[in-house]
């Protein structure tokens, strides 16, 4: 267990994002910082995109009919009444409408916001974070540009010049926040060698990185491998990393474990950042397929076959585009892998919306518009991104499940075509084996 010991300073933590999952993570972290005051500053900043909320008359927080600022409601009543209602938040969570003020002097940045806002947020953060900050991305999805694919933790690291790991798992935010039983998650963090002897040994990774996209990122000073080492796929890191000062506790597996682990939220630490990140993104495509099957009422036999095919394509995709950097056991054994797939294919939002679409005889896009107020599912955006990459690489035929799900979403294929994937996938595996 990490301990401050002779360290003169403590880590300050900021949660960037305050939605359902962001508020849940803030709750977890704030409980831990309160218990481990020798390692962390007790107060946890949570950046909130300011908006007005109307408190219902039957609410114990009702004061007037006038809309109130969400940050003021959270700080006064310690509850995110809009995105995590009914859950009491620790009083040491400070809701802050100013992004730059929220991250001031923070050495641990936890990113938990819709991926479409990440670029703008990183742009606003430039020049406002301490140079030795480290990040954890809770954002599920991938960033595809042309024939290359980037992880969101890579985007964060490149844009801000910091190292960033990833958190993902079989996590239903409302259940975790309510402390219903014990949930689990996986945190992938491979400390850069510049952080003293605390670092894990970097592993070689695939060169399948989109250099075109990378060139759009800020120019960062290249340093020697001896100081910064390699990034999440073995390339010489472009960012000039600043080591965590020796006056702070090390930011390693032990420190992150006590920051995120709770009696109701079990954390497994690994170094496979690519495997954890990809699992969190690709499982949403599989969940859509499972939802289509459920909507058809085809039963558990077809359901299990589709999930198996989905796992096979997830593993194949990860190894093809990220090479030896991905540990198969991350996908097959960790919460971020198979457990998240199972949960998403039983009760996840992508699953439920896909099933609803089939039962109503409408498109998933119509469900998004009517049931989600126009908000896009993670699965639909990821399916489109992944298909764009596969098409650019001429690899659509080698990923029949991923391809057919996207074609169903675009109205180019029927849900009835899904069972054929089992045979097609078997042939694909045999040909590539």
UniProtKB/Swiss-Prot annotation:
Disulfide bonds: none annotated. InterPro entries: 6-PGluconate_DH-like_C_sf, 6PGD_dom2, G3P_DH_NAD-dep, G3P_DH_NAD-dep_C, G3P_DH_NAD-dep_N, NAD(P)-bd_dom_sf. It comes from the Eukaryota. Residues 208-227 have a biased composition (Polar residues). The active site is at residue 283. The keyword NAD applies. One of its GO terms (molecular function) is NAD binding. This is Glycerol-3-phosphate dehydrogenase [NAD(+)]. Keywords: NAD, Oxidoreductase. NAD(+) binds at residues 17-22, 49, 117, 173, 349, 378.
